[in-house]
């Protein structure tokens, strides 16, 4: 279950990212760390690579916005990075690009039990992730999805 502050932090970060020419690809609030850590992944809306200077510049702007919003009242660490090239899908663009590709989906059910499914990525919308498992579409509520990774068939 996500931290109660995460939706507000995500909304603020998306707004700041958009104003700076970035797209928010991922955000995590790691409350088990001391101090807590806010990890943010960004990419340029133009599709160009994010470099270290971009991350440093965005860190300053987002840090100021976080201080002004007073959403995080305790000490925290802010980490800014790019998603890089990896197997984990995170941005809407990733889910559009890799539609029809084989994926492993890790999710929690309503009883908070973790499950893993394999299938072909069908669609992700605001409410759910849909994968094709042997010709049948399985819909998983988006808030229950932990991770979606590209895989190779038969792996």
Swiss-Prot record:
Its main location: cytoplasm. GO terms for biological process: ribosomal small subunit assembly; translation. Pfam families: RimP_N. One of its GO terms (cellular component) is cytosol. Belongs to the RimP family. Required for maturation of 30S ribosomal subunits. NCBIfam families: PRK14634.1 (NF011227). This is Ribosome maturation factor RimP. It comes from Synechococcus sp. (strain CC9902).
């Amino acid at each position: 279950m996500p931290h109660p502050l995460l939706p507000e932090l995500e909304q603020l970060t998306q707004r700041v990212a958009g104003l700076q020419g970035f797209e928010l690809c991922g955000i995590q609030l790691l409350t088990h760390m001391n101090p807590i850590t806010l990890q943010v992944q960004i990419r340029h809306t133009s599709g160009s690579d994010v470099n270290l200077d971009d991350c440093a510049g965005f860190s300053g702007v987002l840090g100021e916005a976080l201080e002004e919003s007073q959403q995080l009242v305790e000490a925290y660490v802010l980490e800014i990075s790019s998603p890089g090239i990896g197997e984990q899908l995170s941005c809407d663009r990733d889910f559009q690009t890799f539609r029809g590709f084989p994926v492993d989906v890790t999710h929690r059910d309503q009883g908070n039990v973790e499950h893993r499914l394999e299938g072909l990525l069908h669609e992700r919308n605001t409410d759910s992730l849909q994968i094709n498992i042997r010709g049948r579409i399985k819909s998983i509520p988006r808030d229950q999805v932990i991770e979606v990774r590209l895989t190779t068939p038969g792996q």
